[in-house]
Design a protein with these regions (language model features):
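Non-catalytic terminal/linker segments enriched in charged/polar, low-complexity residues
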Residues: 1-139, 157, 161, 165-168, ...
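P-loop/Walker A NTP-binding module and the surrounding RecA-like catalytic core of P-loop NTPases
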Residues: 110-113, 119-340
Length: 340
């Protein structure tokens, strides 16, 4: 049975008819300040190491590149991504014959920006809502404790602020806390949450959610799912079943599969990402808890590893601290405020 945590007929903002990115709804200046603050520890750690690596050196040589490789790996950029960046810089050094250490920061900046662009990251991120996709269905995956429910709540807030009618689905039926937390977020944001009894079939919850959303004329549906990795086959089967059942209501659902990762866990986030990519087709990433950590390099490495764009980053506890990921702004905050 479909149960709404709050009144599904609650008033919502008028639905806007144009397809918009959420970056337009926020003050860019405020976003930039939040981003700068969130990446401050990453920047300080990274550039402190970089300054020491080139101390007393006038040109980029093998020793400098070896030091840079170590810096990137210890900054949680990831081994594969680090190798790619070093190879690109080596090619430039070989081509230009002489590259001064004073140029290294700009070269590194350009290569990181290029890598992010190649993985589909752009300057106007976040989810856009095509007019012919209604409701737009987002299935959210990720292990427990990464900020999945919080991300869903903040994402629902942003959609609602943009004038969209949102319905949430509590398909993580294995943890009572997960359903309770989602209902709390639904009440806080002012959007309905569809749930069933604990232990119910998650696919059944997803079916009810989409049916309810269609009946209400909702613009967006966000489905929470269980965050279990101890049984990869079971996870894969469960997510596949949810997708198949949703397609009985919305034939091309889900339109996005958003993987939420905890950026502060560094290398653990890479392993989680690998497991979920094996279990389902991830189309977008949200990297949370970047504020207060020096592990911001994980954003670069995971996007490059998976060849999946980062759509959102979490930079704090406030509703607006879930920011649409903007490649240029991210690189600017990491390296300074010059043009990327």
């Amino acid at each position: 049975m479909c149960i709404a945590c709050i009144d599904e007929n609650a008033a919502v903002h008028p639905i806007k008819t144009t397809c918009m990115g959420f970056f337009d709804f926020f003050s860019k200046k405020k976003n930039k300040e939040t981003l700068d603050a969130g990446l401050e520890k990453t920047k300080e750690s990274f550039f402190g190491k970089l300054v020491r690596a080139v101390a007393g050196k006038s040109k980029v040589d093998d020793e400098v590149l070896d030091n840079l490789e170590e810096i990137l790996i210890t900054s949680d950029v990831g081994a594969d991504t680090t190798v790619e960046i070093i190879q690109r810089i080596e090619e430039r050094v070989a081509r230009d014959k002489y590259v001064g250490t004073s140029e290294l920061q700009n070269i590194l900046r350009e290569e990181i920006s290029s890598l992010l662009t190649a993985c589909g990251n752009d300057d106007e991120a976040g989810f856009d809502l095509p007019e012919d996709k209604k409701p737009y269905v987002i299935m959210v995956v990720g292990v427990n404790g990464v900020g999945k429910t919080t991300t869903i709540g903040k994402l629902a807030y942003q959609f609602k602020e943009a004038g969209k009618k949102v319905v949430l689905g509590a398909a993580d039926t294995f943890r009572a806390a997960a359903v309770e937390q989602l209902c709390i977020w639904g009440e806080r944001v002012g959007v309905p949450v569809v749930k069933q009894q604990m232990g119910s079939d998650p696919a059944s919850v997803a079916y009810d959610t989409l049916s309810s959303a269609k009946a209400q004329g909702a613009d967006v549906v966000i489905i929470d799912t269980a965050g279990r990795l101890h049984n990869k086959v079971g996870l894969m089967n469960e997510l596949t079943k949810i997708k198949n059942v949703m397609r009985k209501v919305v034939p091309d659902a889900p339109h996005e599969i958003l993987l939420v990762l905890d950026g502060s866990t560094g290398q653990n986030a890479y392993e989680q990402a690998r497991q979920f990519v094996k279990a389902t087709e991830v189309t977008a990433l949200a990297v949370t808890k970047l504020d207060g950590t020096a592990k911001g390099g994980v954003v670069i490495g995971i996007s490059h590893l998976l060849k999946v764009p980062v759509k959102y980053i979490g930079l704090g506890e406030k509703m607006t601290d879930l920011q649409p990921f903007n490649r240029r702004a991210f690189v600017d905050s990491l390296f300074g405020d010059r043009e990327a």
